[in-house]
Amino acid sequence: MDNDYGLIKESVIKADSALQTAVNEKDGIRILNQDFFETLISFIISQNKNIPQIKQCVKNISHRFGDEVIGYNCEAFYVFPDVDRLHEVTEDELRECKVGFRAPYIMNATEAVYSGNVTKEKLDALDIEQARELLMTIKGVGEKVANCVLLFGLGRREAFPVDVWMKRIMESMYFDGKDTKKLEIEAFAVKKFGNLGGYAQQYLFDYARTTLFK
């Protein structure tokens, strides 16, 4: 079912008919299988930054430390450096890429992966709670970032990241507009959506951001 998005949409709506509007309005949403290490660093960078700023930081790191690749129409671009290359980079060099206070977090995450303490293979072997806890041993990785890495970098489709937007829409749709703790929202989502949590989250997030709270 992972690549059958028609079936996924039907299953999400079946899990909760209240999602029908969100699903129907946002056709074409996909969850891509992204590189684990790049996803981890990107979401560490994402804290307190908007999307253009995040993209620029990732581009800065790629341009400075990544390999040049010739792509479509012979245009050159730079790929994100692997863990071996980024492990050679100093904190000052990272700061020059405009990552700010996140530089030591990136250093810590790189060391964790490079040393073998936190690897994709280890995380894949754990249940989602254990994997989340292991990710959160990295400095600067809280529950939201860990859930994003689980969903986008490790293919754990049951992960349900909760940020400000998700908190607002979940409170609006399921908690009568009452202020609700993120942990309570996450627990509700796990019970409600199960292995479809990541897909439900994406539909709800985009619907809230572009339509419901526009």
Question: For each of these PLM feature ranges, what is it?
Answer:
Residues 1-214:
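HhH-family (HhH-GPD) DNA N-glycosylase catalytic core used in base-excision repair
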